[in-house]
Amino acid sequence: MRSQFKDEHPFERRKAEASRIRGKFLDRIPVICEKVEESDIPEIDKRKYLVPSDLTVGQFVYVIRKRIQLPSEKAIFIFVNDILPPTASLMSTIYEQYKDEDGFLYILYSGENTFGQLEGVEETL
């Protein structure tokens, strides 16, 4: 899935911005959070986040849920490189594993499990 942020901002500018952010805020992770285009879940009000390194994926999902005002009975899924990261994982761990070459971590969210693969889980038949 293509990132709208990547389409709107050239690579060198994104890389310079991520580098500046990481240099200025050592304990924060630069994250771009965007909605999966086909999803009927609400659009988020901003895409760029500076996330504390010690935040868990589950806590970040809570932040997204609050920003889009999603009721607790509605499902939300987040994807990093088409994988559902474990909710107990630290954002710093996910960042180190999946950060883009420009220095940002790209996260997509959806109301449906559109990609469907859990990290570290293989389907057996």
UniProtKB/Swiss-Prot annotation:
Function, as annotated, reads: Ubiquitin-like modifier involved in autophagosome formation. With ATG4, mediates the delivery of the autophagosomes to the vacuole via the microtubule cytoskeleton. Required for selective autophagic degradation of the nucleus (nucleophagy) as well as for mitophagy which contributes to regulate mitochondrial quantity and quality by eliminating the mitochondria to a basal level to fulfill cellular energy requirements and preventing excess ROS production. Participates also in membrane fusion events that take place in the early secretory pathway.
The major lineage groups are:
Eukaryota, Fungi, Dikarya, Ascomycota, Saccharomycotina
Query: Which Pfam families does UniProt cross-reference here?
Result: ATG8 (PF02991)
State the post-translational modifications: The last C-terminal 9 residues are removed to expose Gly-116 at the C-terminus. The C-terminal Gly is then amidated with phosphatidylethanolamine by an activating system similar to that for ubiquitine.
Give its localization.
Answer: Cytoplasmic vesicle, Autophagosome membrane; Vacuole membrane
The entry's family comment says: Belongs to the ATG8 family.
The record's annotation in InterPro entries points to: Atg8-like, Ubiquitin-like_domsf
Which residue numbers carry lipidation of type Phosphatidylethanolamine amidated glycine? 116
Q: Cross-referenced Gene3D superfamilies, in alphabetical order?
A: Phosphatidylinositol 3-kinase Catalytic Subunit, Chain A, domain 1
What is known about its induction?
A: Expression is increased after the shift of cells from glucose to methanol.
Q: Record keywords: Transport included?
A: yes
Which PANTHER family has this protein been placed in? Answer: MICROTUBULE-ASSOCIATED PROTEINS 1A/1B LIGHT CHAIN 3-RELATED
Q: Which GO terms describe its cellular component?
A: autophagosome membrane; cytoplasmic vesicle
Report the gene name: ATG8
Task: List the residue(s) that the UniProt entry marks as the site Cleavage.
Answer: 116-117
Its main subcellular localisation, reduced to a broad class, is membrane
Keywords from the UniProt entry: Autophagy, Cytoplasmic vesicle, Lipoprotein, Membrane, Protein transport, Transport, Ubl conjugation pathway, Vacuole
Positions annotated as propeptide: 117-125
Report how it sits in the membrane: Lipid-anchor
Know the name of this protein? Answer: Autophagy-related protein 8
Give one GO biological process term.
protein transport
